[in-house]
Amino acid sequence: MPKRTDIQKIMVIGSGPIIIGQAAEFDYAGTQACLSLKEEGYEVVLVNSNPATIMTDKEIADKVYIEPITLEFVTRILRKERPDALLPTLGGQTGLNMAMELSKNGILDELGVELLGTRLSAIDQAEDRDLFKQLMEELEQPIPESEIVNTVEEAIAFAATIGYPVIVRPAFTLGGTGGGMCANEKELREITENGLKLSPVTQCLIERSIAGFKEIEYEVMRDSADNALVVCNMENFDPVGIHTGDSIVFAPAQTMSDYENQMLRDASLSIIRALKIEGGCNVQLALDPNSFKYYVIEVNPRVSRSSALASKATGYPIAKLAAKIAVGLTLDEVINPVTGSTYAMFEPALDYVVAKIPRFPFDKFEKGERRLGTQMKATGEVMAIGRNIEESLLKACRSLEIGVHHNEIPELAAVSDDTLIEKVVKAQDDRLFYVSEAIRRGYTPEEIAELTKIDIFYLDKLLHIFEIEQELGAHPQDLEVLKIAKLNGFSDRKIAELWGTTDDQVRQLRLENKIVPVYKMVDTCAAEFDSETPYFYSTYGWENESIRSDKESVLVLGSGPIRIGQGVEFDYATVHSVKAIQAAGYEAIIMNSNPETVSTDFSVSDKLYFEPLTFEDVMNVIDLEQPKGVIVQFGGQTAINLAEPLAKAGVTILGTQVADLDRAEDRDLFEQALKELDIPQPPGQTATNEEEAALAARKIGFPVLVRPSYVLGGRAMEIVENEEDLRSYMRTAVKASPDHPVLVDSYIVGQECEVDAISDGKNVLIPGIMEHIERAGVHSGDSMAVYPPQTLSQKVQETIADYTKRLAIGLHCLGMMNIQFVIKDEKVYVIEVNPRASRTVPFLSKVTNIPMAQVATKLILGQSLSELGYQNGLYPESTRVHIKAPVFSFTKLAKVDSLLGPEMKSTGEVMGSDATLEKALYKAFEASYLHLPTFGNVVFTIADDAKEEALNLARRFQNIGYGILATEGTAAFFASHGLQAQPVGKIGDDDKDIPSFVRKGRIQAIINTVGTKRTADEDGEQIRRSAIEHGVPLFTALDTANAMLKVLESRSFVTEAI
């Protein structure tokens, strides 16, 4: 059936900020879909609150609204734009929930807007636990016995009838939020109570636990003519019981018989047909390893994390095709863009194995609860492709960037057997490494399979890897063993370790004996048809399929898996850099390992290498492609860290040179440069041990800011107020980088701001200055940033511009750089300089309309700013106010403290823009889900050093009609200044403490600051946790609370007695 002509204008809802459970895969899907709809001639209107994505670029849709995804704003845009149809299935859970809300409020009917892709009834049937159960019963598909409950008592009664363990799943929440496995009544009570609060419809499903079954997923597509196909099936290495987003996954499934595959395939296709979904859908099933029994676990009636993985694993572009199906095209009329010759009706066939491993944030959150369960915790993932399981698994391990280059963490060799087995049984994020260690200690695959329910097939592969390690150890320099190791994915570094030599010598030996990888094409059809996609992976085998072209090429290194501190912003810069390379007439080659992102979409670059970002893997590509040079400044710290080894190997680094990168990163060289350029910085010193640090701090005076050099996202960075805390920091945190000393700086409490600049070596363009709302001490990635600055004097802005120019020229910067300043008493100090693209590039590019990464790339390739039409200096500022606000994922991470400090904790960002600061702030708060009603109660629990300031805020809250509550000390201080606050009890004062007030819904906001001593704050942590769990707005910085007050004041009328 040809595409529909009765609709012209389509609105697409994006997925909003990146949070755990809903990451960059939706940026990829949404970008694909919008372009796909435009290609068919429709007018596309996009709404998304996330500035960090390619999806919210002007070129992606005809009209792009970066506005909050809330009923209020989406309705406004619908009324203004009057689209004919709405496509909600590409915006993750956010998009689906928004569509439901619009429909339930009658907005879609009122405006005559039709839903495309998935019918509302299908969303309901898949998401509402009760309807889903009914549908499965009608289709005679087995599901675990379960009951819908609306109260804790009902849950306990049902569990008594089926027996523990049971699983709790709240309705309409994302990534398993609020759910969990319960082994007894106490756990059930706790998890259900929390789950009911988090479910927008206060219902939970209590179901029999089928933990230990194999978890299999099918990615299916269907069109309006009822054609349906399986794009790909995937098997979790971890059995049921661990969220699929936190599981290691292989595609295609490895351990099912043909009969089992057909059985689950039929089930998946019958489900998508029953739901009448037009587009993509993901079905998760549990298969009993000992019989042919299976259960349907859940269905996602939309494009999901797994579909991004399936798209990259097979090359079959699910989101692109889902958009075409939504407007009436059928699978047998759409050409598969990968082959360019076959139709989309052909099911992909794979002649390789794909491994996906999640990337967790526990390197940043050492206190976080690492046990894995039904609630997702990973921030990102890596994917690797190989010709066997060993190869793809080991390539994925070294893609993770957690300091491992093999399936082993050397420290685990020291762990006792008891601890080892406990970690093998109770899965944490690093279980693979514990299981591998158990095999090295001689536990048999049978024993481990019994303990973990991991299929013995995979454990045999781990055993095979260990056997190769032993062979290597026994036969140093043996070429035959070397070949076997390389066929199974071993890195040069691991081989060197086992041979007692260097990676470099192993590489030389390989090159001399022509043991080099070949590159194979990902073509969706196992090479049955000719394919035109330039999408490759390495393997050691015959016949290289990646042919070097005659055109000069430039290689861009991506930023690897998404983690806190290095998010989708860097992918954004990578994609823009590629556009500029192509515009300059070169062939653009991308190398990256992240399946969720736009940069690894084969249609973005001229060639894509899906490979780990390690020196060995990058050099192999360079040896084959012989590019003009490599661009490292858009791939975050991942790419910057490769600059030095690549340069040493004779590779041309384009842009700022390695010596100059070092001058910005190395403390002593940087100080030297600032002295020469006559630019002030807070006094500081370097220390390599505890005594030196204590000495330095005494000399500078407390408070001091301590941090290791060469890290991204403020890892292991702290503000320390006294010697005792400093010594404990030196003992626990310095392991962050032993070769690099620790920096001890005077901590200046002032106004913080940052600048991104672009330099051609002679002139410097400064697109804008961003002022932080939170004063210095909160990591820049966790601060709200305002552009243009609202409180900086003209003189300060001129000084900032002047210092920026001096630094860019003085450090021989070519391309992008980011500088952070702190201002105190009108004096400007430089805190740090990053000679690369930073996480503010997408935001600033959007609000100034300067495509910064593209401009920087053109300069790197030899053009000048004046040739591109830009002036030297500060760019004229926008007349509107724009705010970038952070978004956190604390609900997913138990035991992680939500207190903001110099270590970054946010996973994503939103943007609010309007004519005034207050309006822009309102939008930013709404978009980041910080919604405050116009009246209610606010509770203050404030450290002594901030009580003065808090008093002023409390008075203003009172003036607009808020009730003020406070903890004992704060209440006494307020009272002595004539403000009566209702006192709340200490933690543990049964019904009178803050957590119990929060549970009863009597508190609308919490303002909690922490004093100089970090140690005595367990009460504060409980208070903050209760706010997070119940979705009560929490402010740990008074500046943020002040910004929220500005919004509330601007929205309320002042009532004064005469």
UniProtKB/Swiss-Prot annotation:
Binding site for Mg(2+) 3: Q820, E832
Sites where the protein binds ATP 2: R707, S746, I748, E752, G777, V778, H779, S780, Q820, E832
Pathway assigned in UniProt: Amino-acid biosynthesis; L-arginine biosynthesis; carbamoyl phosphate from bicarbonate: step 1/1; Pyrimidine metabolism; UMP biosynthesis via de novo pathway; (S)-dihydroorotate from bicarbonate: step 1/3
One Pfam family of this chain: CPSase_L_D3
Span of domain ATP-grasp: 133-327, 671-861
Cofactor(s) the record lists: Mg(2+); Mn(2+)
Region named Oligomerization domain: 402-546
Residues the entry annotates as binding ATP 1: R129, R169, G175, G176, R208, I210, E215, G241, I242, H243, Q284, E298
Amino acids binding Mn(2+) 1: Q284, E298
Binding site for Mg(2+) 1: Q284, E298
Catalysed reaction equations from the record: hydrogencarbonate + L-glutamine + 2 ATP + H2O = carbamoyl phosphate + L-glutamate + 2 ADP + phosphate + 2 H(+)
Region span, Carbamoyl phosphate synthetic domain: 547-929
Protein keywords: Amino-acid biosynthesis, Arginine biosynthesis, ATP-binding, Ligase, Magnesium, Manganese, Metal-binding, Nucleotide-binding, Pyrimidine biosynthesis, Repeat
EC number annotated for this UniProt entry: 6.3.4.16, 6.3.5.5
GO molecular function: ATP binding; carbamoyl-phosphate synthase (ammonia) activity; carbamoyl-phosphate synthase (glutamine-hydrolyzing) activity; metal ion binding
Cellular component GO terms held in the UniProt record: cytoplasm
Annotated region (Allosteric domain), positions in chain: 930-1058
Binding site for Mn(2+) 2: E298, N300
Region (Carboxyphosphate synthetic domain): 1-401
UniProt remark on cofactor binding: Binds 4 Mg(2+) or Mn(2+) ions per subunit.
Presence of the UniProt keyword Ligase in the record: yes
Task of the protein: Large subunit of the glutamine-dependent carbamoyl phosphate synthetase (CPSase). CPSase catalyzes the formation of carbamoyl phosphate from the ammonia moiety of glutamine, carbonate, and phosphate donated by ATP, constituting the first step of 2 biosynthetic pathways, one leading to arginine and/or urea and the other to pyrimidine nucleotides.
Domain notes: The large subunit is composed of 2 ATP-grasp domains that are involved in binding the 2 ATP molecules needed for carbamoyl phosphate synthesis. The N-terminal ATP-grasp domain (referred to as the carboxyphosphate synthetic component) catalyzes the ATP-dependent phosphorylation of hydrogencarbonate to carboxyphosphate and the subsequent nucleophilic attack by ammonia to form a carbamate intermediate.
Assembly description: Composed of two chains; the small (or glutamine) chain promotes the hydrolysis of glutamine to ammonia, which is used by the large (or ammonia) chain to synthesize carbamoyl phosphate. Tetramer of heterodimers (alpha,beta)4.
Protein name: Carbamoyl phosphate synthase large chain
Record organism: Streptococcus pneumoniae serotype 19F (strain G54)
Encoding gene per record: carB
